[in-house]
C-alpha cells in the first residue's frame, strides 16, 4: 500500500510578541533537539475471499443421459462467484490533524524516538518494535494440472469419426474401469496385489481414469481464489454504509455498480471512552527548585501526546447474511492525553510503547 508523506502546519505562538503568529511546515522525523511525529487514525480493512468457478461443458455432454443415465448436464459455459469468507483488521494511518513537535529539556535523558515509515510515533526508548506496514498479499493457489481425456482413449476411440460412437466407446471404458475396481475391492481379481498399499494405489489410479473420462460427459469446473480488500477510515458512526457490492456473475463490484447486491458495514462507537493509563496522580513526583513550582504543568504540554481510543462495534453483512462482526478500538472516536515530560527527566530512561493502529499507550516502564 502506497503512502504519501504528509505535511502539517503547526501554529506556534511567539514568546516575545503576543499578537504575532508563526506558521511552520513540519515533516515527521527525529532531530538533535527533539522530534516531529504523527499520531495515527484507525482504518478498518475488510477483506473478502472470493472463489471464482468456471464450468466448461464436456465434448460429449449431449450423450450423458443416453449412455451414463446422467441428466441435467449443462451444454453451456458458466462462470460464477461466491464469497468464501470475510475478515476484519485495523491499521494505523498518519493523522495530519495530530502532528506534534516534542522537545525534551536539556537535563533529561536523551530519548530514542521510534517512528514508522510514515512518521507515526511507535515508542520512546524502545529499540525493538514490530509493526505492520502493509497488508500481506494472498498467495495465489497453484492450479491443478488437468489430464487430457484423450490421453486415456483407446486406439478405437481415437480413430472413430463419430461423436455418437466415441460416446459409446468412452462410456464402455468407464464401465470397464468400474468393473475392475469392484473386482479388486471384492478380491476376485487374479492380478490383484496382496498388500493393502498396492491395492490403494491401483484403486486411486482407476478412480482418476474414471474421473478424466467422465469429464467428456459432465464437463469440468475450475476454481480460482482471490482476495479483495476495502479500507474505511470512519470519522463518525455508520449504519448500512455500502462498502461494495457482490454479484454471483461478476464478483466484487464498486459500491456505485448497481449490478450487484450491496455489502453493508455498521460502525457503532461505545459511549464510554477509556481513562488515561497514566494520570496526574501516577506521574512521578518532582521537587522543583524555588520559583519553578508553576512550570511543572507547562512541561506536561512538552511531553508525549498519545491517543485514548474508543471502542466500536463493526459488522459487515448483506441482506441475507452476517459475514463478520468484531469490536475494535478506534483512535478518532476517542481523545488525546499527554505523558508528562517529567517522565523523561529521570536519570533512568523511561520506556514507552504505543499501539501502531490506535496511538494508545500499550506500556510504560523503566
Each language-model region and where it sits:
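Sec/Tat signal peptide C-region and signal peptidase I cleavage site
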Residues: 15-19
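Sec-dependent N-terminal signal peptides
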Residues: 4-13
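N-terminal amphipathic/basic membrane-interacting segments and domains
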Residues: 20-366
